[in-house]
């Protein structure tokens, strides 16, 4: 298959400031594209140029960084506007088999839904309205733009919370799909311990402590298992 993955925001900003990085190969979306590539698919990744690494890299597949415009209104850390996505998709709409885009509340996702509606798959992580400007832009988008112009796209939620949210606005919503695995690890560790680890940045939105508490509650009813576990984050 020929797959185009559109993920303008490659990693989380810090208070609106996009950090400078030396590589994008540690991002979740790069691992996903690499998995497609290793499975024999022809994959291209589109991202905002604001997230390009400081030094030039060699990639296993095509990576296209496109310029964002109107940055004062369409902040690259929140809602980047990449007009080059329209041109890129128009030139390849007859050849591509699937366009995988990030979030329904996204201009590139709208472009994909207009150009190749039946080939567009959108993964939905958000389970609530964006709080910018008292949620009005988000509410207008989901109630009008998404309902009118993005109805034919297939929506894949990342959680049951996001599934319940997006079902209020979109007709074609699938079942949640969880995280995959990192495909670059080539051998298992021989000195493994019974541990439960959560790996990630401690943003309050991620609610990491709830994962720890729920796993601890799960083990509390299984004393024979819990005694062998170290729980930490």
Model-derived segments and spans:
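A short, active-site helix/loop in glycosyltransferases that binds the activated sugar's phosphate group
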Residues: 49-54, 146-174, 181-185
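N-terminal subdomain of nucleotide-sugar transferases
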Residues: 1-51, 94
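Short His-centered aromatic/hydrophobic patch
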Residues: 101-107, 124
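Acceptor-binding helix/loop patch of EC 2.4 sugar-transfer enzymes
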Residues: 12-16, 68-73, 120-148
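Conserved donor-binding/catalytic core segment of Leloir-type glycosyltransferases
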Residues: 4, 156, 188-206, 211-217, ...
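Membrane-proximal helix-turn-helix segments that form the acceptor-binding/catalytic region
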Residues: 30-34, 90, 114, 128, ...
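A short, charged, and often flexible helix/loop element on the N-terminal side
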Residues: 59-87, 129-131, 137
């Amino acid at each position: 298959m020929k797959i185009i993955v559109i993920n303008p925001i490659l990693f989380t900003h810090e208070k609106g400031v996009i950090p400078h990085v030396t590589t994008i190969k540690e991002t979740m979306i790069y691992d996903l594209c690499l998995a497609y590539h290793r499975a024999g698919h022809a994959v291209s990744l589109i991202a905002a140029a604001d997230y390009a690494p400081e030094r030039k890299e060699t990639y296993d597949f095509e990576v296209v960084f496109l310029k964002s415009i109107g940055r004062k209104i369409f902040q690259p850390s929140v809602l980047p506007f990449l007009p080059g996505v329209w041109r890129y998709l128009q030139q390849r709409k007859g050849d591509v088999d699937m366009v995988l885009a990030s979030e329904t509340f996204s201009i590139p996702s709208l472009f994909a839904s207009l150009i190749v509606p039946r080939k567009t798959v959108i993964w939905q992580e958000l389970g609530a309205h964006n709080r910018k400007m008292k949620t009005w832009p988000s509410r207008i988008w989901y109630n009008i733009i998404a309902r009118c112009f993005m109805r034919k796209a297939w929506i894949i939620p990342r959680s049951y919370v996001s599934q319940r949210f997006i079902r209020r606005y979109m007709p074609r919503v699938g079942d949640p799909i969880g995280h995959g695995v990192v495909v670059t690890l080539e051998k298992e560790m021989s000195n493994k311990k019974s541990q439960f680890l959560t790996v990630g940045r401690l943003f309050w939105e991620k609610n990491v402590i709830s994962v720890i508490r729920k796993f601890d509650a799960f083990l509390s009813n299984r004393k024979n298992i819990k005694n062998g576990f170290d729980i930490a984050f």
